[in-house]
Regions:
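Membrane-interface "cap" regions at the ends of multi-pass membrane proteins
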Residues: 1-61, 256-257, 263-277, 290-299
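Loop-to-transmembrane helix boundary motifs in multi-pass membrane proteins
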Residues: 148-153, 338-344, 358, 390-424
Length: 496
């Protein structure tokens, strides 16, 4: 898929009395030409970042665990969660492709403190290297190398690769596409080898058991776990918001007018970043035809590449979990416990008995791969988001340039992560874990509200969302915030 930067950011010089689109409290957006859309059907694209962030412990552990606890009928909640995420993705893309701005800038146009809320939440939630633990622990099971060594080396390697890359987006898109392709095909093959058609049928049919909710799920022990699993059906926390930055760097829509972020080694070659985004002429039929082409392109991204891949990986892991319990009934009790690493190792052992020890190692390799995907995606996305907000809204930050700010945040979170891995709890201080979990889930409801405000107030009427789209995004806000606060007030627990 080629979404090259055409025209470049410097190709359209300002003219006197140029037309602009006034949106909110920031500088107006000059009118520019919308690039032609690429073919709708494609393989690679910015969605690989969302898949890398979204296909994690929710898909490989949390949902298989709930299926074993409450039966496959509980998966209707997963279907709602991941489908809702696909609609959120399309609405994030609406603003990013129409303006070349991130959703953070859109939030600032509505109410600048709203943007700073997301800035603070990102630091509070995503500086902890806990997402590395499962992958590194799985790698230790395979190789015997201590997981802390693997995690520290992995962090340094990520920093070096991103720093040396000429254009970070291009390198990361290719690497993540390869890793995710391996994960999708590999888990499907293992599931086919150890599972049965009965496992597949029950997993699929359970997604349509709408309304099923066993009484034992309405307890302080399990309702927060279900809330957490719904929040982690696909990308969680602020990961959808970061997707707008990857869209921009891919050159999607008006992002073609915005320079790409470069590695530190090539930061001096960076073009000047404009202080605001751009808008196309929504009264021009030719421009609107191109806009519809871009919407078809991103819809393919959302439905097939995001929704389809996330669903396939979750089905594969659920089939593996069901077959593991059938092969070794003792695995059920282990998976029902709270120790994620022990549960995954038990599943690997059961898979080994089904074929050979190689299969068990392959399964653990997939868990390690998930950890690597999450590390690459999270560190890049966090650094992009913080650099974007700092560059545009912190006085004096423009002197450093976007690429250098990206490098500062990247190496800052890497060094902090190394210190925590060596001297502290990888998931963060236990006393604030509930607060972090609350903020992560709360951010998802908050960005649904933000989307409604930004897309319905900051965009021209011809490209604003339809009423039914607003209803779905509004339902998302109620879905996330409603479950979160019900869990908090009914059971005194945030999420599990």
């Amino acid at each position: 898929m080629d979404t090259s930067k055409t025209p470049p950011a410097t190709a359209t010089p300002p003219v006197e009395d140029e037309r602009v689109w006034k949106a909110g409290r920031l500088a107006p957006m000059p009118i520019r030409k919308l690039p032609d859309a690429p073919p709708s059907v494609h393989i690679l694209g910015p969605t690989v970042f969302l898949v890398a962030l979204g296909v994690g412990m929710g898909e490989s552990y949390m949902w298989p665990r709930l299926v074993l606890l409450f039966g496959p009928e509980i998966r209707w909640l997963f279907l709602i969660g991941v489908t809702l995420q696909a609609f959120v993705m399309l609405e994030m893309a609406r603003y990013a492709m129409a303006t070349g701005e991130s959703i953070f800038s859109g939030a600032a146009r509505v109410f600048k403190p709203l943007m700073w809320f997301f800035f603070i939440v990102a630091i509070a939630v995503y500086i902890w290297p806990g997402h590395l633990s499962a992958g590194a622990a799985a790698f230790e099971e395979i190789t015997g190398i201590p997981w802390t060594v693997t995690a520290v080396v992995g962090l340094i390697l990520v920093g070096v690769v991103f720093s040396l890359a000429k254009v970070i987006y291009n390198v990361l898109e290719n690497v993540l596409s390869l890793l995710i392709g391996t994960l999708v095909l590999g888990t499907a093959v293992v599931a086919a080898m150890v599972g049965s058609w009965g496992d597949v049928a029950s997993t699929l049919s359970g997604m349509f058991s709408f309304g099923y909710f066993p009484s034992q799920a309405m307890s302080a022990a399990w309702f927060p776990v279900i809330v957490g699993a719904c929040a982690f059906a696909g990308p969680s926390g602020m990961q959808q918001m970061w997707y707008t930055l990857h869209l921009r760097d891919s050159g999607a829509g008006m992002g073609a007018h915005i320079p790409q972020i470069r590695g530190l080694r090539h930061a001096g070659q960076e073009e000047e970043m404009p202080a605001r985004g751009f808008m196309f002429d929504t009264e021009d039929p030719a421009e609107m035809a191109k806009w519809k082409g871009w919407r078809r392109w991103v819809t393919f991204d959302a439905l097939l590449l995001f929704w389809g891949v996330t669903m396939l990986v979750t089905i594969s892991f659920t089939v593996i979990a069901q077959s593991a319990v059938r092969l070794n009934p003792g695995v059920r009790e282990v998976i029902q416990g709270d120790d994620r690493e022990v549960a995954l190792t038990a599943m690997a052992n059961a898979v080994s008995h089904a074929g050979s020890s190689v299969l068990g190692s392959v399964f653990l390799g997939f868990i390690a791969l998930i950890g690597l995907n999450a590390t690459l995606g999270l560190f890049d996305s966090f650094s992009r988001g913080q650099a974007d907000m700092t560059y545009h809204f912190v006085p004096g930050a423009k002197k450093l340039g976007m690429s250098r700010l990206y490098g500062v945040f990247l190496w800052g979170v890497i060094l902090f992560g190394i210190l925590i891995l060596l001297f502290g709890p990888a998931d963060g201080p236990s006393g604030i874990l509930d607060t972090l979990a609350f903020l992560s889930t709360f951010a998802m409801g908050a960005y649904c509200v933000t989307l409604l405000l930004v897309n319905n107030r900051m965009l021209p009427k011809p490209i604003r969302p339809k009423w039914w789209t607003n209803v779905i995004i509004g339902f998302g806000a109620v879905f996330y915030l409603g479950m979160l606060f019900y869990s908090l007030f009914a059971f005194g627990v945030v999420v599990g």
